Amino acid sequence: VLDTKDLQVFKVTVNGQDAKFVFGEKHRFKGTPLEITLPFELRRGQEAIVEIAFESSPKSSALQWLTPEQTSGKKHPFLFSQCQATHCRAIFPCQDTPAVKLTYYAEISVPKELVALMSANRDGEMPDPEDSCRKIYHFSQNVPIPCYLIALVVGALESRKIGPRTLVWAEKELVDKSAYEFAEAEAMLKTAEDLAGPYVWGRYDLLVLPPSFPYGGMENPCLTFVTPTLLAGDRSLSNVIAHEISHSWTGNLVTNKTWEHFWLNEGHTVYLERRIGGRLFGEQFRHFQALGGWRELQNTINTLGDKNPVTNLIPSLNEVDPDATYSSVPYEKGFALLFYLEQLLGGPDVFIGFLKAYIQQFAYKSIVTEDWKQFLYSYFKDKVDVLDKVDWNSWFHAPGMPPVKPTYDMTLANACVALSQRWIKAQECDLDSFSSADLKDMSSHQLIEFLALLLLEAPLPVSHVKRMQQVYDFNAINNSEIRFRWLRLCIKSKWEEAIPLALKMATDQGRMKFTRPLFRDLYSFDKSRDLAVKTFLEHRASMHPVTSMLVGKDLKQDQ
């Protein structure tokens, strides 16, 4: 039995013999099982080669087909895939579960002016013998991976070398900017190897996608996919690269066996990402990023509700589409647990020893939380009394914020807290006391935190946000993380002049982290609700299928 979704199957053979096949019942989001009957009895140890002739649908939930107008170059179409969590089945029949790992090789035929890339080693190219206008690219991935990590992109791509094992790929218009933005990749890789062990994947290339890519990054092996919203111009959003690099160990080598245990992938990856940041930019910076993550978690839980079972670290996903529950919870609640354990068990040096041993123990396997916990107990066997004091049940199975808040170094956060408090406490008559000098010693990271703190409070009076624009000119800032929080702040304060800017950001790019909250806020504001729905319906056809589905739910257009 194989998973499929919106696929047509024409013929199946097993070891060259025709095999009978039938489709089972179609499921709401899981697709349709393909049941193949072997034409002969299999003996133990006998190999069977199953060949399937099939075709995917133009509406495949794993693929976005962009018209030339939707690309930077405006000349050629573009295709990219996004298989996580359960969309690989919408490209080809497979065992679409992270419990199963496989190696793969592929040949991709494309028009010769375009380039094909996959989450694999590039094994060269040749003219297509069947069509002189096309060429064939060869790929092989020799490390076993879950099929959610199979990825394909086709477009007018160019590359720049930014390290001994790293090319950055993008359309011509963005490739030099991307090469500058991600120049720290090799330093991050070296730091990650030092923390987590050898990098087993060979190459580490980066691909910058068109703006509709729905995530910040996707850790496809050998070829990380990233959103162009990371191109801030000052490398300030490079923590996403550290995050995707970290997945080369946590997620891609040690993998969650089911999506309920997604925190094993993401919590450990955020932990490693921040350890890399700590090595490169100092321990205070790591604590500052960790505190920002705690705010992000507070924000998510405010949105979802603190009794909502999807805020459990290990949610129940029976008959639940993993895409529909995607949030910062597995990332930030998972990280908070690891950061708390680090502080409980003897500090960063002690805890990284555990993480390295954990990766060695479970590399190339898929595991559940109980495997992780048993290994934690065996590694820290002399500290079992400390571990027994942890409220495991609340951490794993209770909704809302974690039962314990870790300790954070506040050095870099204090300026953000002080400035946000000044704005919160300010009366109309105090607004003249603010000036552009307030921000002169603050980094982009601190501006993000300042705005995040304001977003956790009751909305500011509209006079305050108008004054903020006057003195800080946030509208002129293109850093996507700053702009996103600033526009949310404006809409929450019901500043009508911000409506077109928020709609523009929600539709100019399709990273769900930005697009969904902006649309939700615009929908909550009576003055922009109808326009938000109208704008969504106008742009829907050009949106990524997953983004379109989830924004449709947010705006009550789909059930």
Language-model features: locations:
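Hydrophobic alpha-helical and helix-loop surface patches within well-folded domains
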Residues: 9, 14-17, 30-34, 139, ...
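Short loop/turn hinge sites at secondary-structure boundaries
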Residues: 155, 282, 304, 457-458, ...
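Long, ordered, helix-rich scaffold segments
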Residues: 327-334, 343, 351, 359-370, ...
